[in-house]
């Protein structure tokens, strides 16, 4: 057996996270569960999935498996180097009972879920309330999560006698060692369901569409998360639901940009407004604000509108809006505008690379030699 077969059984990569391994296990175990899949070979596949998950869900066993393969995960090495004592630690731990084993019958919280919600630029600044709808594993409505057919109850597992674990003998360099593994009949619950629920087929869960209202505070930004306790997937053995993490994605604005509580706006003005000054209505998310542009304003000059930015999530208060001036140079001029600009250049003493063309009256004066 190569060192990737267990990963292949679950359909995950070798660098998969524990969360990815857990989700893959749940998906594959449902796919091949003998009570659901009646095809030939499904039961064998189911056992292979159980074996793979038993190893990969345990960090120490997984490390030994990655290094030595199945023999390493089970404590039976063919050899080791100076850094390969992790497997022997597992052996002694199993033999002497060190480290203990998590109670498989204990209630376990359900998996967490993520949901991405899009907000407009303004919604992120002022806050909003959104109703989100998503599919999740919920407690079965027929059996209330017990997995048993209504009117019946689970019985003590005959293989593990309710402990949820069984003893397995393993051949190691030190001889035969006995270790405890999760019971493959009850999957660690300690109970066996003789008559399974017709809705959930004994899992105790069913996929349902769930809706929840999310209050989004003012001032949120892209990437921030809101945690909703108990809105994730159903737990196990009577454990609580997991949590829902709502991930914020703020859509861009056509007018503004934002960094934290500061909003940025680019104001395009003419060179006449820049030279002579003007009073202009500036758009903000809070409404238009009148702002004075002083005479002689240069392009790139930034003005601050205090309190016209986004709320500060921490510390309270309101950010500012920065208004940066951009002087727009006209690309098309009529004759009157050109004459006026040439006159301005002459009055300013500017030397033109291309002097202005003579007008009709100038040409007449030249022809008559009149000053």
Swiss-Prot record:
Zn(2+) 2 binds at residues 157, 160, 183, 186. Signal peptide: none annotated. GO terms for biological process: chaperone cofactor-dependent protein refolding; DNA replication; protein refolding; response to heat. GO terms for molecular function: ATP binding; heat shock protein binding; unfolded protein binding; zinc ion binding. Binds 2 Zn(2+) ions per monomer. PROSITE patterns: DNAJ_1 (PS00636), DNAJ_2 (PS50076), ZF_CR (PS51188). CXXCXGXG motif repeats lie at residues 140-147, 157-164, 183-190, 197-204. A zinc finger (CR-type) spans 127-209. Residues 5-69 form the J domain. SMART domains: DnaJ (SM00271). Its cofactor is Zn(2+). Its main location: cytoplasm. Zn(2+) 1 binds at residues 140, 143, 197, 200. GO terms for cellular component: cytoplasm. Keywords: Chaperone, Cytoplasm, DNA replication, Metal-binding, Repeat, Stress response, Zinc, Zinc-finger. It is found in: Cytoplasm. Belongs to the DnaJ family. NCBIfam families: DnaJ_bact (TIGR02349), PRK10767.1 (NF008035), PRK14276.1 (NF010869). The J domain is necessary and sufficient to stimulate DnaK ATPase activity. Zinc center 1 plays an important role in the autonomous, DnaK-independent chaperone activity of DnaJ. Zinc center 2 is essential for interaction with DnaK and for DnaJ activity. Homodimer. Participates actively in the response to hyperosmotic and heat shock by preventing the aggregation of stress-denatured proteins and by disaggregating proteins, also in an autonomous, DnaK-independent fashion. Unfolded proteins bind initially to DnaJ; upon interaction with the DnaJ-bound protein, DnaK hydrolyzes its bound ATP, resulting in the formation of a stable complex. GrpE releases ADP from DnaK; ATP binding to DnaK triggers the release of the substrate protein, thus completing the reaction cycle. This is Chaperone protein DnaJ. It comes from Streptococcus agalactiae serotype Ia (strain ATCC 27591 / A909 / CDC SS700).
């Amino acid at each position: 057996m190569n060192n990737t077969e267990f990963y292949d059984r679950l359909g995950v990569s070798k660098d998969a996270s524990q969360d990815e391994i857990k989700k893959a296990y749940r998906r594959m175990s449902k796919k091949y569960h003998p009570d659901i899949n009646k095809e030939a070979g499904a039961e064998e596949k189911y056992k292979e999935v159980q074996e793979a998950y038993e190893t990969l869900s345990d960090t120490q066993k997984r490390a030994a498996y990655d290094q030595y393969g199945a023999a390493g995960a089970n404590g039976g090495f063919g050899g080791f180097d100076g850094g390969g004592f992790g497997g022997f630690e597992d052996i002694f731990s199993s033999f002497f009972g060190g480290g203990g084993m998590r109670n498989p019958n204990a209630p376990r919280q359900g998996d967490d879920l993520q949901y991405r919600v899009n907000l407009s630029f303004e919604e992120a600044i002022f806050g909003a309330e959104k109703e989100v709808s998503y599919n999740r594993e919920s407690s079965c409505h027929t059996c209330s999560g017990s997995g048993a057919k209504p009117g019946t109850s689970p019985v003590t597992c005959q293989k593990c006698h309710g402990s949820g674990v069984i003893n397995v003998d393993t051949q190691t360099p030190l001889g035969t060692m006995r270790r405890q593994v999760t019971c493959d009949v009850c999957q660690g619950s300690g109970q066996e369901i003789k008559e399974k629920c017709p809705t959930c087929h004994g899992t105790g869960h069913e996929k349902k569409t769930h809706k929840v209202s999310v209050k989004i505070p003012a001032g949120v930004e892209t990437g921030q998360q809101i945690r909703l306790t108990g809105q994730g997937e159903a737990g196990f053995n009577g454990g609580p639901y997991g949590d829902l993490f709502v991930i914020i994605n703020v859509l861009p604005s056509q007018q503004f940009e934002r960094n934290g509580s500061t909003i940025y706006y680019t104001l395009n003005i003419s060179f006449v407004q820049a030279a002579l000054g003007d009073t202009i209505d500036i758009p903000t998310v809070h409404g238009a604000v009148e702002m004075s542009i002083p005479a002689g304003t240069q392009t790139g000059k930034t003005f601050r509108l205090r309190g016209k930015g986004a709320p500060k999530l921490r510390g309270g208060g309101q950010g500012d809006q920065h208004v940066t001036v951009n002087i727009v140079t006209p690309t098309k001029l009529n004759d009157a505008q050109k004459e006026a600009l040439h006159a301005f250049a002459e009055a300013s003493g500017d030397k033109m690379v291309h002097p202005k063309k003579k007008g009709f009256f100038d040409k007449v004066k030249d022809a008559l030699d009149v000053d």
